[in-house]
Amino acid sequence: MMTQSIRRSMLTVMATLPLLFSSATLHAQANSVQQQLEALEKSSGGRLGVALINTADNSQILYLADERFAMCSTSKVMAAAAVLKQSESDKHLLNQRVEIKASDLVNYNPIAEKHVNGTMTLAELGAGALQYSDNTAMNKLIAHLGGPDKVTAFARSLGDETFRLDRTEPTLNSAIPGDPRDTTTPLAMAQTLKNLTLGKALAETQRAQLVTWLKGNTTGSASIRAGLPKCWVVGDKTGSGDYGTTNDIAVIWPENHAPLVLVTYFTQPEQKAESRRDVLAAAAKIVTHGF
């Protein structure tokens, strides 16, 4: 009886002061999330950046979201999107074939190495770069666009003044602390990823192709996806580099909720540090709790 009375009293207070209660609750929840992310970062021994956008109301959860981090292979999303943008005015572009030579191969080429002395279409290169993180595929996309600066120019055309791509694979993964090359911020990347996959940055056909590629990613099972309910749909792009840099950027479709856009960037002090995908999974679990 006493429990029921307490519940009725709480409901009365909530009904009488909904705005005050809601504001206090949200503030407490936000503080809890920040504290959990801070504790995660401290225990990991590295630097963690997180940006989550809830597209239901455009609210955000941010942690070091305005600090620069090396993008590593998450930059492949921008290069692939730039080619998709070109295809809006050239319907045959994605079928254009690109020669693959043995001398093109770099340090990680799971798809391109199967096509040495042959060709791949730009569509195949886009899929290889995004779904298998093929570095030769990324370099071919960059070459087609005219160089890293053209990828940056595409970002600027979207209103992203933060993204910068300076090098090709694999040197763009050096992730030297304090080096601004090949970096962005979690918030800038989250906003751009939202525009590319859920907004109007690309025409519908091209937007759908980008989302399809991201949903088909094969490299993200231990990163953001590992921190989410199995029934949620995820499209993501991972990245890794020196200094134990471990990244993942994702569009997430929870059950019965508007999409979420989540960027998790993590780096460490030692150049030879191991990747920490578990940190990204833990961060994803923290910021998506309650959705």
Curated annotation (Swiss-Prot):
<dbReference type="InterPro" id="IPR023650">
    <property type="entry name" value="Beta-lactam_class-A_AS"/>
</dbReference>
<dbReference type="GO" id="GO:0046677">
    <property type="term" value="P:response to antibiotic"/>
</dbReference>
<dbReference type="Pfam" id="PF13354">
    <property type="entry name" value="Beta-lactamase2"/>
</dbReference>
<dbReference type="InterPro" id="IPR045155">
    <property type="entry name" value="Beta-lactam_cat"/>
</dbReference>
<feature type="signal peptide">
    <location>
        <begin position="1"/>
        <end position="28"/>
    </location>
</feature>
<feature type="binding site">
    <location>
        <begin position="237"/>
        <end position="239"/>
    </location>
    <ligand>
        <name>substrate</name>
    </ligand>
</feature>
<keyword id="KW-0046">Antibiotic resistance</keyword>
<keyword id="KW-0614">Plasmid</keyword>
<dbReference type="InterPro" id="IPR000871">
    <property type="entry name" value="Beta-lactam_class-A"/>
</dbReference>
<dbReference type="InterPro" id="IPR012338">
    <property type="entry name" value="Beta-lactam/transpept-like"/>
</dbReference>
<dbReference type="GO" id="GO:0008800">
    <property type="term" value="F:beta-lactamase activity"/>
</dbReference>
<keyword id="KW-0378">Hydrolase</keyword>
<dbReference type="GO" id="GO:0030655">
    <property type="term" value="P:beta-lactam antibiotic catabolic process"/>
</dbReference>
<comment type="similarity">
    <text>Belongs to the class-A beta-lactamase family.</text>
</comment>
<feature type="active site" description="Acyl-ester intermediate">
    <location>
        <position position="73"/>
    </location>
</feature>
<keyword id="KW-0732">Signal</keyword>
<protein>
    <recommendedName>
        <fullName>Beta-lactamase CTX-M-5</fullName>
        <ecNumber>3.5.2.6</ecNumber>
    </recommendedName>
</protein>
<comment type="function">
    <text>Has cefotaxime-hydrolyzing activity.</text>
</comment>
